[in-house]
Amino acid sequence: MMLTTLLDEVERLRAARPGRVLIGIAGAPGAGKSTLALALAAKLDHAVTVPMDGFHLANVELRRLGRADRKGAPDTFDAAGYAALLRRLREATGETVYAPTFDHVLNEPVAGSIPVPPDTEVIVTEGNYLLLDTPPWDRVRQLLDLAVYLSADDGPRVDGLLARQHAKGLDPDAARDWVYRSDEANARVVEATATHADLRLHRA
């Protein structure tokens, strides 16, 4: 039902305006943004997903800035670079554009990983801070043709975050510390941006 609702909105948008459209899916850590973005793109012709997480600052830079223990907070991303890529994706429809992704094994962004060919009609981007209204993040919202906020029940969402940290090799105590100190602090920031969405969906 959630995917069907989103598909209907996207098809209405595509029928109403020509050219490439940008769909943004925001939500707290663990809400299911990546899963929904991939599912949406799979149902559409000529669609590509471009994650915000490709704009994480490199670990060496986070250490230099003293922000490594807050990785995932708004100031640990190249937000201006992300907005610039979205603008280029909107405007450069006659060439292949390469977007970065995030490698969860390396725990680092990887440049030039996602090709966006000229015939791409829909860009689906997802991440925590697409609706944040503080500079330079506010540039992102202005570039989206449809802004979606995805929420989820806290219990399953947090369980998923804990499982994610366990998969990285953290012991239970370290996983809980990271999730409740970092991920959940970021979740509160993200939840405050939900009112800036065009469409709100909930994953039960």
Regions found by a protein language model. Give the residues of each.
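Extreme N-terminal, non-catalytic leader segments
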Residues: M1-L22, A28
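Residues at the beta-strand->loop junction immediately N-terminal to the Walker
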Residues: A26-P29, E126
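Conserved lysine of the Walker
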Residues: K33
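Hydrophobic positions on the alpha1 helix immediately C-terminal to the Walker A/P-loop
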Residues: L36
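Post-Walker A helix-loop "phosphate-sensing" segment adjacent to the P-loop in P-loop NTPases
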Residues: A42-V50
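Conserved nucleotide-sensing/catalytic segment adjacent to the nucleotide-binding pocket
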Residues: P51, A58-L106
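ATP-dependent NMP and nucleoside kinases share a basic, alpha-helical "lid"
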Residues: L106-R164
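Small-molecule kinase domains that catalyze NTP-dependent phosphoryl transfer to phosphate-bearing small molecules
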Residues: A111-G112, P135-D138, H166-A204
